[in-house]
Amino acid sequence: MYKIIGKFFDEDIERECKTPDYAIGVFMAYVQKGMQYTDNYTASDAIDEAVDVSRDVYTHDLPHYHELTGDMWLELSKE
């Protein structure tokens, strides 16, 4: 079981995902959502993040942490 926790402004994020692919997809959906609120985050940055989180999930190098801004951060871990 994979778990995503984080903060999106005032919203607390807590999601459980059964498969690694689903966890990566949900994680990146939140990253994509957060990109709408940042000026210095590009599509290339999102691709780099997708590569990083996928690598960490499949090499079991978790938790994976990502911060878009101080108000928006995510952590993916395996329970």
Give, region by region, the residue ranges found by the protein language model.
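Hydrophobic beta-strand residues in large extracellular and virion-surface proteins
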Residues: 2-4, 15-17, 23, 74-76
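A short, exposed loop/beta-hairpin motif centered on an aromatic-Gly-Thr core
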Residues: 8-22, 36, 40
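Short, mixed-charge low-complexity intrinsically disordered segments
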Residues: 29-79
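Short aromatic-glycine-(Arg/Gly/Cys) micro-motifs in beta-strand/loop hairpins
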Residues: 1-12, 26-30
